[in-house]
């Protein structure tokens, strides 16, 4: 290690090595290696020397600069070969534009698929798809199969880009939409490209049939190989055509197009095994002489677009492997099949649940965008047929049965009441469309946006309460036996609470909370949010029953026949049951964490620049914009959760027993649910072992150990299995 003591000359000769520089230069260099190593010996293992001039900013800069990914922009200077574009490569004879062999076609197609997927995963077109020279200008290609495939890939990219841009549920880390001035085959129609692909497909199918083995005939190995290779090209070309046709179907406004896409996805899935089994037939990439692992093979040049990249450090594009490509397409097909199912839903609440469940799989940006554009066609109508206002009214009817939406009620035909409810419903459209759009974003961005949308729902809550009061006053004059109190307000409050719960729970999924914070997060959920949610659901259920009774009495008055009463399943009963289970899980975790803290098993940081209060207030800051339910401030929380108010205050064994009862209660509730879904089974996988662990801890197991427990979130994203170490 050397250090420059003074600068006497300029930095000419910067390409020389350090010893050569030292010899040539007039500068006085001092070797500090020995001194540096001796100074390092004084530091203990893991200890760092803090210098005033070397703070966190400089440390991060050093880490970033030394990361090999930061050398991506420098690769061009370290290549031993000449980088050629498509036209230069044709003149140079390094690329074939006609008479491509079957292995060449297979290899190029597979690598193109890999580049396409890498682009969909957030890298730029310049570093992925457009490293394939054939894609730059398909007009130069004379080979019909290669030309049709290149145009097909361009069209897939163009429609995918249009869909993702239209849905607007991507961030810079999800998707790069820049085309860098490349033509996206706009001069050729979609129909023409699918026709060209079909022609190649038919031609390949004829070759597949002509090389097929016949009964009793001895098989020529060369003919068999040709048969396998023709089948491989046929499968890839057909897959490209089907994928393109699916994306075209999603651009149509008719709902029938979704059914068409569903059928095509089945065809695409059937082709994947043939593609997977023939991966070895394609030409393989040669060893790259550059740093990085971009494939170098005929038709590909990873550095061809290096000059198009922005002056900032380019992202390091690691092209996925061919084996992974098939698995990715299989998952993409499954996701698109799921997207197609949304058109079968009619209730807004079911649609919201569908979006939540779909988002939990962390789907790719393309499938998220397709779901958004299928739901709201041109941002006007749901599935292109239903008005969002009608969906909101149906959701209100099914959830809380407000008298104003009942045809048998006086308010239904009252102009003033009609104006009130119509105005409220119109104001609901934007927040609910925004909420559905939020579920299209990636999981990390969703949480941030949920925090912001609470403000809109708080305003809606205020309006709902005012409309309820106005409608109630009108109703009392005509039908004193009926009430219109807290109908619309209950419905908006329900959605408010769901957003708040989702906001807090997603923090566990994203690993945002430290272990010492768990106890107040679970407390807020169990004692506050789930308690409010259950009372809101019970109130909605009560409103439904009251409305049903009035309807039955009106029916009785008209009909003298006695009708047999069937036991009706309450629409909200399952949700109330699930909320009870969630509340018990949260309460069990809260008491577990408090007991661990008492036993000294929770490591707490030495707060220097902040405190627990600062952290608490930061975690619940978005809730300050909500008036109902009112936010619980830190001092209020400390007072409400203070165990000293009990006489005598419970000790850790009693808390472990209480926690075990909560886990047992959750287990019993869930085991009684008919037709349990995946979510029920996932929670049971946590409730059962936690019940056993709490029993062990209550009996004094590992009482003296101060080793913190492990929290395993693999079974469920929000509730960990507690493991004693």
UniProtKB/Swiss-Prot annotation:
UniProt entry keywords in alphabetical sequence: Cytoplasm, Phosphoprotein
Disulphide-bonded residues: none
Subcellular location: Cytoplasm
One Gene Ontology biological process: negative regulation of apoptotic process
Record bears the keyword Cytoplasm: yes
Pfam families membership: Mak10 (PF04112)
Gene Ontology CC terms: cytoplasm; cytosol; NatC complex; nucleoplasm; plasma membrane
Biased composition (Basic residues): 558-571
Start and end residues of each stretch annotated as Disordered: 548-573
Record PTM Phosphoserine, positions in chain: 187
Function: Auxillary component of the N-terminal acetyltransferase C (NatC) complex which catalyzes acetylation of N-terminal methionine residues. N-terminal acetylation protects proteins from ubiquitination and degradation by the N-end rule pathway. Involved in regulation of apoptosis and proliferation of smooth muscle cells.
Record note on quaternary structure: Component of the N-terminal acetyltransferase C (NatC) complex, which is composed of NAA35, NAA38 and NAA30.
Family assignment from sequence similarity: Belongs to the MAK10 family.
Protein name stated in the entry: N-alpha-acetyltransferase 35, NatC auxiliary subunit
Organism lineage: Eukaryota, Metazoa, Chordata, Craniata, Vertebrata
